[in-house]
């Protein structure tokens, strides 16, 4: 049916239709009509499949070739996940062996760590930031981050320096939150806001 329709379109227009591919013999001689060798027995040649066949066959061929190319893995080519899991197992075994060989040691803490423990007990619901600045600029940056920009009048500068340099709250890094709170209260006090 499709073939007869294409033949009638060819006779009226003089050009072969796009839907059905006709043989070159049809172009030369209008009386002889032949289908391609692979299209015998069908009324309408499968025109859409002819354009798709080569890429599909090449893709299938590549797929078959790549799946067949598998070599057994050596022990040297282990994945990163396997290496990490082995390392975790080794450390767990090492710790379990260490606990059975040596009894736990009693460690005495210094005065500073006891102070830090007191701070964590008093502020159980707040998260304590422990920052250990190596120089005063880092201490300044950290306190400015907590308090924001503060201004102290000349009358208040002596109290500020005493608080900033001599109190335990502003010299021990574990107490910097308290120091920030004290500095903001000092900046907002009547003595510092006057003049």
From Swiss-Prot:
One GO CC annotation: extracellular space
Tissues of expression: Highly expressed in the swim bladder and single cells of unknown identity in the head.
Pfam families: ALKL1_2
Chief localization: secreted
Subcellular location field: Secreted; Cell membrane
Keyword annotations: Cell membrane, Cytokine, Disulfide bond, Membrane, Secreted, Signal
Disulphide-bonded residues: 156-192, 170-179
GO biological process, alphabetically ordered: iridophore differentiation; positive regulation of ERK1 and ERK2 cascade; positive regulation of ERK5 cascade
Superkingdom of the organism of origin: Eukaryota
Disruption phenotype: Reduced number of iridophores in the eye. Fishes lacking alkal2b do not exhibit any defects in trunk iridophores in adults. Fishes lacking both alkal1 and alkal2b show a complete loss of eye iridophores. Fishes lacking alkal1, alkal2a and alkal2b are embryonic lethal and display total loss of iridophores.
GO molecular function, one term: receptor tyrosine kinase binding
Keyword Repeat attributed: no
Function: Cytokine that acts as a physiological ligand for receptor tyrosine kinases LTK and ALK. Required for neural crest cell differentiation and iridophore development during embryonic iridophore development and adult stripe development by acting as a receptor for LTK. Also required for iridophore formation in the adult eye.
Subunit structure as annotated in this protein's UniProt entry: Homodimer.
Family: Belongs to the ALKAL family.
Protein name: ALK and LTK ligand 2b
Species of origin: Danio rerio (Zebrafish)
């Amino acid at each position: 049916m499709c073939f007869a329709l294409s033949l009638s379109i060819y006779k009226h227009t003089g050009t072969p239709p796009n839907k059905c591919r006709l043989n070159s013999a049809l172009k030369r001689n209008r009386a002889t009509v032949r289908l391609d060798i692979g299209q015998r027995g069908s009324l309408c040649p499968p025109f859409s499949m002819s354009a798709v066949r080569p890429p599909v066959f090449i893709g299938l061929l590549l797929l078959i070739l790549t799946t067949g190319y598998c070599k057994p893995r050596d022990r040297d080519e282990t994945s990163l996940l396997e290496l990490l899991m082995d390392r975790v197992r080794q450390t767990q075994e090492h710790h379990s062996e260490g606990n059975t060989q040596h009894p736990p040691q009693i460690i005495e803490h210094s005065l500073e760590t006891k102070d830090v423990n007191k701070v964590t007990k008093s502020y159980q619901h707040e998260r304590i930031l422990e920052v250990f600045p190596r120089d005063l600029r880092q201490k300044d940056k950290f306190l400015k981050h907590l308090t924001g920009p503060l201004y102290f009048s000349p009358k208040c500068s002596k109290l500020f320096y005493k608080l900033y340099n001599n109190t335990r709250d502003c010299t021990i890094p574990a107490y910097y939150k308290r120091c920030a709170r004290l500095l903001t209260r000092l900046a907002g006090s009547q003595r510092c806001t006057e003049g």
